[in-house]
């Protein structure tokens, strides 16, 4: 039974841990990856589908990540989501390069978070990417890896014993392990940059990586010091679930924070001896980690990447019809924008316009400076004023920062922001926050139209923006 649980959890990771977990994965491909017969893989995926951790997609015998897996990922990532975004975005601002976070998984290191460089020529790091090259600084920074001394930029040390560097092809990695309060390595943080910018950016990147690492480790100390949120206690007499369903319940309980076997048993309604066996299976599958004294358990960080990797394709596929419906109903232009570094990036747009002879220029796939973006203040509303000020581009004046922070406070207070376009006369935008399964603001919906038309219908359109944001948030889990 434990082996079936282990294989089921490995199947979940195979489906959810990809760069695009919403893309169809054929049963045959999964069977080959896990070394299963086709019939066994098919039965396993059908069970995952029934449980909500996978769902049918595309043609017959293909599956994608399930909504329950996305919710598990977001819930597990929630305690560190805001601080992680801030630390990595700041490192990206200081260097101009790609910043990524990776965790050990079977076969290598998996990228679970990334802030990609906005340079035309850059070294990418995609959430879900599996790093397998043994020479990679990210791989060598993980616990249990051999470290080869050498010169910076040549797969060696940098002088700081916590920093390693490597050059693979035309890309340089500067990496450092991130340790939890118990002394365990929870992840590896790195900057990736092209070799042609190494000379001018290496020292800056080392400093940025080290600063971000310290910030994340400080957050981990705070998180561990918090009391676990109270959870529901399972009712007595509940029919024992299947082994795989029982494992999922254990994972969902641990996603809210570390707990003991006894605490997990009380919360899930399972016997303590069964919980111990399930936790052992979850550890064997690489999804649960133990405290140093083996008395408390929590989800490993590998699951944190699932909801992030699913985010953009889900928005494009499932939120676009919602934006189109709102734009058509209100006779406005509708957009969904996300944060890319400290720029706003449009993922979805629907261009309608109340005004004969007028046209809105398309923004799809184009980054825009945060200060002039319709959704800019909304996208950073989870950050503190001090954090926003530190991230704010230095080319802008203090007056512009004060005005921007005022708009951030407004959207925090009202849940919606109406503002005149920064550098586009005659346009008013209304934005509202979209939250992913971690509860963190991951996008902004924007309704845009001519000044007179938007002012005349302000209350109606503000409610439309709130509803659209809530509907998109529901899609994300």
Feature map (PLM): residue ranges:
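Long compositionally biased, domain-poor regions of proteins
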Residues: 93, 181, 216, 256-257, ...
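A short, hydrophobic, proline-anchored segment that marks a local hinge/packing element in signaling
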Residues: 174-183, 430-438
């Amino acid at each position: 039974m434990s082996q079936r649980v282990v294989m089921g959890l490995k199947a979940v990771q195979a489906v959810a841990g990809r760069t695009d977990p919403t893309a169809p994965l054929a049963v045959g491909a999964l069977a080959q990856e896990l070394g299963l017969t086709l019939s066994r893989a098919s039965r396993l995926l059908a069970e995952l589908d029934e449980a909500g951790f996978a769902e049918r997609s595309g043609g017959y015998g293909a599956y994608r990540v399930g909504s329950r897996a996305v919710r598990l990922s977001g819930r597990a990532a929630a305690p560190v989501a805001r601080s992680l975004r801030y630390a990595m975005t700041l490192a990206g601002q200081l260097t101009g390069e790609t910043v990524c976070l990776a965790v050990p998984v079977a076969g290598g290191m998996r990228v679970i978070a990334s802030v990609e460089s906005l340079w035309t020529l850059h070294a990418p790091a995609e959430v879900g990417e599996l790093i397998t090259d043994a020479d990679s600084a990210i791989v060598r920074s993980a616990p249990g890896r051999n470290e080869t001394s050498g010169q910076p930029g040549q797969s060696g040390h940098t002088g700081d014993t916590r920093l390693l560097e490597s050059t693979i092809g035309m890309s340089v990695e500067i990496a450092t392990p991130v340790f939890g309060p118990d002394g365990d390595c929870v992840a590896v943080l790195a900057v990736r940059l092209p070799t042609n910018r190494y000379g001018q950016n290496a020292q800056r990147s080392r400093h940025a990586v080290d600063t971000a690492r310290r910030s994340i480790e400080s957050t981990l100390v705070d998180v561990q010091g918090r009391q676990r949120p109270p959870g529901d206690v399972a009712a007595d007499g509940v029919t024992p679930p299947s082994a795989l369903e029982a494992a999922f319940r254990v994972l969902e309980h641990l996603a809210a924070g570390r707990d003991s076997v006894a605490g997990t048993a009380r919360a899930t309604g399972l016997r303590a001896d069964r919980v111990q066996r399930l936790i052992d299976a979850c550890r064997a599958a690489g999804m649960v980690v133990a405290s140093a004294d083996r008395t408390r358990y929590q989800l490993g960080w590998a699951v944190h990447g699932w909801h992030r990797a699913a985010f953009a394709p889900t928005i494009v596929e499932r939120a676009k019809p919602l934006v189109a419906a709102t734009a058509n109903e209100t006779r406005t232009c509708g957009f969904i924008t996300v944060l890319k570094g400290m720029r706003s990036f449009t993922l979805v747009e629907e261009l309608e316009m109340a005004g004969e002879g007028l046209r809105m220029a398309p923004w799809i796939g184009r980054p825009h400076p945060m200060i002039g973006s319709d959704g800019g203040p909304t996208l950073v509303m989870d950050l503190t004023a001090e954090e926003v000020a530190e991230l704010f581009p230095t080319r802008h004046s203090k007056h512009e920062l004060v005005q921007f922070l005022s708009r951030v406070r407004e959207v925090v207070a009202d849940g919606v922001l109406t503002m005149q376009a920064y550098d586009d006369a005659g346009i008013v935008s209304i934005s509202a926050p979209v939250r992913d399964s971690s509860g963190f603001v991951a996008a902004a919906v924007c309704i845009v139209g001519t000044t007179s038309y938007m002012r005349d219908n302000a209350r109606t359109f503000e409610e439309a923006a709130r509803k659209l944001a809530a509907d998109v948030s529901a899609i994300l889990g």
